[in-house]
Amino acid sequence: MDDDSRGLRVMATSEKPLSPRDPPAEFLPLLKQSGVFSESRFEEVRSKVLAGDYPIDAQELARRLIQDRLLTEYQAKRLLSNRPGSLMIGRYVILEKLGSGSMGRVYKAQHRMMDRVSALKIIAPEISNNERVVARFQREMRLVGKLDHPNVVRAFDADKDRGILYIAMEYVAGESLGQRLRTKGPIPAAELVG
């Protein structure tokens, strides 16, 4: 089991990944179960498959949905691996993995109703039962929620879904702080307090 499946307590319909020639009869239920698409978007895709406008094998269908920007590569990989439950946390659709650390993982995610892209920080389930970790996470959520500075990412939401603690924060595209420091060196103080 990989880091993502452990970290999100995957709910799959079976343990068997889809083979390259599995029909959409296998892929479409996973797509629906994943929650990535609204009901109307799912029906639109299903209709295109039935009409012959979309490919009939699972791999080709996934490729086409990526090409049409309806799925991300990360989402397609999870679905083809028969892990649809790992693509929704609360009201957030997971788009891609951004990174991981000792406390958990960070994903690029989109709020289903608000259509806002966020960085979704998820505490690893292995440590989310630890009272000290939960207390630390709750303190972090409260503190980040009170911060308002142009150089600090804002927190939008925090909750628990299926036992998974998460916080949704402002998504800032570009390199990480670690990457920035490695490539350009220390950041001048004037730029930090800017």
PLM regions: where:
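Short N-terminal regulatory/linker segments that flank and modulate the kinase catalytic core
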Residues: 1-95
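Conserved ATP-binding/catalytic core of the eukaryotic-like protein kinase fold
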Residues: 23, 31, 66, 77, ...
